Structures are given as C-alpha cells and as structure tokens.
C-alpha cells in the first residue's frame, strides 16, 4: 500500500512540474487589411509600403499585394 501511495505521489509531482513548465498560449489578434489611404500609384516597394502604413496610418504592417489590375499598398490593422 505504501508503494502505491508513493507512486501516486510521484505521478502527481511529475504532473505539477510538467504544468509549471507548460508555455502559456498567446492568442494573436486578427488583422484586417485595407488599401492604403496615403499611397499613390503602383506599389513596387514592400519596405516603403510597410513604413508608410506604420508611420502615417498607424497600421501594424503593410505590403504590396496584387489587387486587379495592379499592385496596391495594403495596410494591416487589428480588426
């Protein structure tokens, strides 16, 4: 009986240690895309688009995406 109790205690201790090292789950907010309101013309420079979206429009990031009929600067904001 004592051996059974020590095995149960050992399993419980292992469970506690495992739970302590478990990484917390991070939930990322969804991002919604919107055409840049400050970009003019065809977008050919991802870095410039990203910087403009972040600095001028307060977006989290931006990139040049193909939207028929040309590439546009698209900014990404939290939904």
Swiss-Prot record:
Keywords: Antimicrobial, Disulfide bond, Fungicide, Plant defense, Secreted, Signal. It is found in: Secreted. Disulfide bonds join 32-79, 43-64, 49-73, 53-75. GO terms for cellular component: extracellular region. Its main location: secreted. The keyword Methyltransferase does not apply. InterPro entries: Defensin_plant, Scorpion_toxin-like, Scorpion_toxin-like_sf. Residues 1-29 form the signal peptide. It holds the Pfam family Gamma-thionin. Gene3D superfamilies: Knottin, scorpion toxin-like. PROSITE patterns: GAMMA_THIONIN. It comes from the Eukaryota. One of its GO terms (biological process) is defense response to fungus. Belongs to the DEFL family. Possesses antifungal activity sensitive to inorganic cations. This is Defensin-like protein 3. It comes from Raphanus sativus. The gene is AFP3.
């Amino acid at each position: 009986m004592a051996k059974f109790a020590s095995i149960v205690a050992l399993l419980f201790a292992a469970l506690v240690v495992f739970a302590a090292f478990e990484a917390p789950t991070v939930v990322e907010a969804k991002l919604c895309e919107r055409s840049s309101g400050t970009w003019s013309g065809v977008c050919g420079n991802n870095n410039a688009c990203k910087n403009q979206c972040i600095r001028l429009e307060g977006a989290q990031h931006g990139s040049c995406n193909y939207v028929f009929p040309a590439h546009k600067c698209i900014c990404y904001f939290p939904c």
